[in-house]
Regions:
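Intrinsically disordered, low-complexity acidic/polar and Pro/Ser/Thr-rich regulatory regions
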Residues: 159-172
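Long beta-strand-rich cores associated with HINT superfamily self-processing modules
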Residues: 8, 16, 20-158
Length: 172
């Protein structure tokens, strides 16, 4: 059971870091950085918080399989990666639980659109009002629109890069 002597073995978000990126496809740079800084051995993923806890404060490792929370219908950008895809709910974010200096640390990565939407959703349609069918429907609609805006920013980025490539090719 949880008490003041072992809380650090149970609580995975006592320390949290949120990283923002402009374009969703930049997630791979974030992922590669995390994996390069922390040992990533699936055999060390924590199943039993109390018994699987590594007491060595100098052992820095990824403690759980990284997760990508996304909505059904979102881009398949995470498919085929070494990340668990979770599609329940309206939440969008990447989650890593790492062990650092004797504590679990939650590291999240998301786009600015995802962060902006989560703040609006949290302010207007948080858990207390999710019983309201109309608010729930509008929340779902706005979440889908936010996801489309996120996708459009990536599309425009690729379009700009293609145009620059074509312009460079014609200049030769």
């Amino acid at each position: 059971y949880l008490d003041h002597t072992n809380f650090h073995k149970y609580v995975t978000d006592l320390i949290g870091i949120r990283v923002f990126f402009l374009y969703r496809e930049d997630w791979i740079h974030f992922h590669r950085y995390i994996v390069s800084q922390f040992e990533n051995n699936p055999e060390q993923y924590v199943v039993d918080r109390l018994n699987d806890f590594d007491e060595n404060p100098n052992h820095y490792y990824i403690a759980e399989l990284p997760k990508a929370y996304k909505r059904p219908g979102d881009s398949k950008i995470y498919d085929g990666s070494e990340i668990a895809i979770i599609t329940d709910g309206i939440y969008r974010s990447l989650h890593y639980i790492v062990k650092y200096k004797g504590y679990y640390v939650e590291i999240q990565g998301r786009t600015l659109f995802e962060e902006g939407w989560s703040e609006v959703d949290h302010d207007i349609v948080y858990k207390e009002t999710m019983d309201d069918e109309m608010l729930r429907d509008y929340s779902g609609l706005l979440n889908r629109l936010s996801g489309l805006a996120d996708e459009m920013s990536s599309y425009f980025r690729r379009l700009k890069q293609e145009k620059e490539n074509i312009d460079m090719h014609h200049m030769k």
